[in-house]
């Protein structure tokens, strides 16, 4: 998909990207999983080469932040959660050249969608491509801050479950949720640190106007304030995991203790039975016509009753 936006009176407006020649008026060219024809069109109309999929996946700093004859290049992670609530980081390739911003990505991202919605009613302050780039980074940081707050809320709810729960399945679900939250927190941290590196590169290499230089420093301060909060999430997750495992061990030890007591209680009768067996002369049960099937039924009930009781107690 190819989207193009022009800047009129410091306000972004969408261009009809299907018309030939409209890209020349664009200040922002946004490509989402572009096909070969869209890549060729950008190359033909604007003379701009776009990053390949392999280049997007490269994690070396020299391949993610650099400047060449095709412009200033920044590859940065953006956080997302898909329809199944699976979290991930998608790389977006930013290129600034000749007063135009190019963005290339493989999927739709919440930060971009939110920024496009905001531009319908908001105007840019200085109206340049660096402000566009920094606005997108600001929107990303806001999204990451919201994600950290959501993790905090989920951890508070899990804390009550772990501290007050007495059912084994509650602990199992809590541990599974904790693992998911830890994964989300790690991806948020990776995105924060990657954005920090990208902005530091931008401040060093680009000749930012004074307004955008201050804007970049403000975003960097926001990142520095979020990183300690993100770190505390890992400490909270680790504490709750250890607490849950401790309660599970206590519960297992209690169950094993009950089994041990039951075994000890039945050990003396078993010892007597094994010593004397069924070797007495006077045994009225030997004359019962239903003695054998009755004994079989008694054995089945004797084995089934403890099983059902232990199952009801969630010991099995």
Swiss-Prot record:
Compartments (UniProt record): Cell inner membrane
Gene3D superfamilies: Magnesium transport protein CorA, transmembrane region
Keyword Magnesium attached: yes
Motif Probable selectivity filter positions after renumbering to this chain: 277-279
Top-level taxon in the UniProt lineage: Bacteria
Transmembrane intervals: 258-278, 290-310
Pfam families: CorA
GO molecular function, one term: magnesium ion transmembrane transporter activity
Main function: Mediates influx of magnesium ions. Alternates between open and closed states. Activated by low cytoplasmic Mg(2+) levels. Inactive when cytoplasmic Mg(2+) levels are high.
Note on domains (UniProt): The central ion permeation pathway is formed by the first transmembrane domain from each of the five subunits. Mg(2+) binding strengthens interactions between subunits and leads to the formation of a symmetrical homopentamer surrounding a closed ion permeation pathway. Low Mg(2+) concentrations trigger both a conformation change within each subunit and a loosening of the interactions between subunits. This results in an open ion conduction pathway. In addition, this results in a less symmetrical shape of the whole complex.
Quaternary context: Homopentamer. In the absence of Mg(2+), interactions between subunits are weakened, and dimers, trimers and tetramers can be observed in vitro.
Name recorded for this polypeptide: Magnesium transport protein CorA
Originating organism: Sodalis glossinidius (strain morsitans)
Gene name of this polypeptide: corA
């Amino acid at each position: 998909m190819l989207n193009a936006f022009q800047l009129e009176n410091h306000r972004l407006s969408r261009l009809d990207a299907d018309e030939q020649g409209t890209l020349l008026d664009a200040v922002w060219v946004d490509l989402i999983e572009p096909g070969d024809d869209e890549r060729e069109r950008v190359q033909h109309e604007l003379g701009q080469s776009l990053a390949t999929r392999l280049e997007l996946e490269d994690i070396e700093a020299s391949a993610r932040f650099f400047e060449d004859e095709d412009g200033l290049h920044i590859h940065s992670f953006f956080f997302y959660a898909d329809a199944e609530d699976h979290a991930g980081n998608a790389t977006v390739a930013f290129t600034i050249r000749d007063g135009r911003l190019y963005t290339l990505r493989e999927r739709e991202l919440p930060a971009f969608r939110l920024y496009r919605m905001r531009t319908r009613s908001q105007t840019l302050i200085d109206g340049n491509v660096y402000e566009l780039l920094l606005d997108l980074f600001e929107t990303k940081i806001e999204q990451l801050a919201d994600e950290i707050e959501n993790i905090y809320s989920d951890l508070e709810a899990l804390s009550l479950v772990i501290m007050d729960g007495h059912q084994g399945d509650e602990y199992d679900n809590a541990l599974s949720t904790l693992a998911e939250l830890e994964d989300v927190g790690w991806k948020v941290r990776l995105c924060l640190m990657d954005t920090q590196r990208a902005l530091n590169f931008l401040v060093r290499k680009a000749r930012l106007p004074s307004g955008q230089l201050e804007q970049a420093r403000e975003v960097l301060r926001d990142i520095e304030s979020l990183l300690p909060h993100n770190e505390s999430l890992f400490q909270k997750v680790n504490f709750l995991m250890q607490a849950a495992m401790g309660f599970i061990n206590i519960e297992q030890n209690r169950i094993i203790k009950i089994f041990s007591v039951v075994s000890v209680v039945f050990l003396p009768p078993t010892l007597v039975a094994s010593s004397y067996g069924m070797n007495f002369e006077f045994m009225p049960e030997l004359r019962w016509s239903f003695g054998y099937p009755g004994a079989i039924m008694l054995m089945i009930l004797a084995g089934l009753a403890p099983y059902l009781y232990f199952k009801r107690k969630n010991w099995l």
